[in-house]
């Protein structure tokens, strides 16, 4: 519907998924990413109950969150329903994180979804792909401002981006950080290397 989705298999990484020719995740190393975007904010925030995941249609982030008993609700806004269907078919060990009764999937534009939310979430995880194509609007000042309004006073936003260690990603990373720092009074960066 919105993007070309392919699933391949390799001896090194097992099955892996691509969107429009770009690798999104593989079954061998997706745990690194999922653990980093979940366990760091959960270690910092004392009482996360209500979570919004933007993207997240593979179920990996919600699967990690569901390990915490205090989680009461997870809203996943994944624009492309076909992405969810493909992940359920080819990555059942990851997509099991979509089957819990606390998880609600909305196939909707994330920016529009956020505009109607105020002071609602303890944690927002932007699990969208890198800032190009259909996800480009999820890396703007308006988007970060909408996230800020949707968070409770002690809420946390976590977002991912390309590696600042690669020249082709460095400028985009800098630009993203400036937008976030402009909106959020307290902003910190942490990194994980994913092969």
Regions found by a protein language model. Give the residues of each.
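Local beta-strand/beta-hairpin segments that build beta-sheet-rich folds
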Residues: 1, 24-25
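N-terminal auxiliary segments of SAM/dcSAM-dependent transferases
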Residues: 1-16
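Residues that form or immediately flank small-molecule/cofactor binding pockets and catalytic motifs
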Residues: 12, 81, 110, 192-194
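Short strand-turn-strand beta-turns centered on an Asx-Gly dipeptide
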Residues: 20-21
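Active-site-proximal loop/turn and secondary-structure-junction residues that shape catalytic pockets
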Residues: 130, 163, 193-195
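Class I S-adenosyl-L-methionine
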Residues: 171, 175-195
